[in-house]
């Protein structure tokens, strides 16, 4: 049984609201996955802050209208599931990439970031982006390195003096 007009409108509104908040989107063909495998994929997506939904292409085109993912409209053909990254740009790509390694039936068709559509081959680059926490840790380490090096250098001068005095003391005691 098909969806009623009200259900379709609600679905379009839901996907449009998610698309407005999302950082990136991945479209993947799910033909060949069982219901159990789809449930496992949905569970994995939820755990990683990814909105995953199978939407009819016509409804998906309406949902992404007016968002930065409007560029995807021409690519929405065939049985696709849409995965939107809500927390960090690489989350959806990491989920789809990891799941497609286990299940070859899941084929990435498109990747959209920043108002541009990229081929499926760019999934690897998007998946390798660091999470927000990892990026902040890398930035902090980069900022901390010069200060730490300066502190070590400044600490070395008195340390060298202490070692020299200790060596002179040992030499006098030995003599």
Curated annotation (Swiss-Prot):
Q: Which UniProt keywords apply?
A: Ribonucleoprotein, Ribosomal protein, RNA-binding, rRNA-binding
Q: Name one Pfam family in it.
A: Ribosomal_L10
Annotated Gene Ontology cellular component terms: large ribosomal subunit
Transmembrane intervals? none
What the entry lists under InterPro entries is as follows: Ribosomal_uL10 (IPR001790), Ribosomal_uL10-like_sf (IPR043141), Ribosomal_uL10_bac (IPR022973), Ribosomal_uL10_bac_type (IPR047865), Ribosomal_uL10_CS_bac (IPR002363)
An annotated GO BP: translation
Q: Name one GO molecular function term.
A: structural constituent of ribosome
CDD domains, per this entry?
A: Ribosomal_L10
Q: What does this protein do?
A: Forms part of the ribosomal stalk, playing a central role in the interaction of the ribosome with GTP-bound translation factors.
Q: Member of which family?
A: Belongs to the universal ribosomal protein uL10 family.
What HAMAP family does the annotation carry? Ribosomal_uL10 (MF_00362)
Quaternary structure (record): Part of the ribosomal stalk of the 50S ribosomal subunit. The N-terminus interacts with L11 and the large rRNA to form the base of the stalk. The C-terminus forms an elongated spine to which L12 dimers bind in a sequential fashion forming a multimeric L10(L12)X complex.
- PANTHER family the UniProt entry points to: 39S RIBOSOMAL PROTEIN L10, MITOCHONDRIAL
Descriptive protein name: Large ribosomal subunit protein uL10
- Its source organism is Alkalilimnicola ehrlichii (strain ATCC BAA-1101 / DSM 17681 / MLHE-1)
Source lineage: Bacteria, Pseudomonadati, Pseudomonadota, Gammaproteobacteria, Chromatiales
């Amino acid at each position: 049984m098909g969806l009623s007009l009200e259900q379709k409108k609600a679905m379009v509104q839901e996907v449009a609201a998610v698309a407005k908040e999302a950082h990136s989107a991945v479209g993947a063909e799910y033909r060949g996955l069982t219901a159990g495998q789809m449930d496992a994929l949905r569970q994995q997506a939820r755990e990683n802050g990814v909105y995953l939904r199978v939407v009819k292409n016509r409804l998906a085109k309406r949902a992404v209208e007016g968002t930065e993912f409007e560029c995807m409209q021409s690519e929405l053909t065939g049985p696709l599931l849409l995965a939107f990254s809500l927390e960090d740009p690489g989350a959806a790509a990491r989920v789809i990439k990891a799941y497609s390694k286990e299940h070859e039936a899941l084929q990435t068709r498109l990747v959209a970031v920043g108002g541009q559509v990229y081929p499926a081959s760019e999934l690897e680059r998007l998946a390798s982006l660091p999470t927000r926490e990892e990026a902040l840790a890398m930035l902090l380490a980069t900022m901390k390195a010069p200060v730490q090096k300066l502190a070590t250098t400044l600490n070395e001068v008195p340390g060298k003096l202490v070692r020299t005095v200790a060596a002179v003391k040992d030499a006098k005691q030995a003599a």
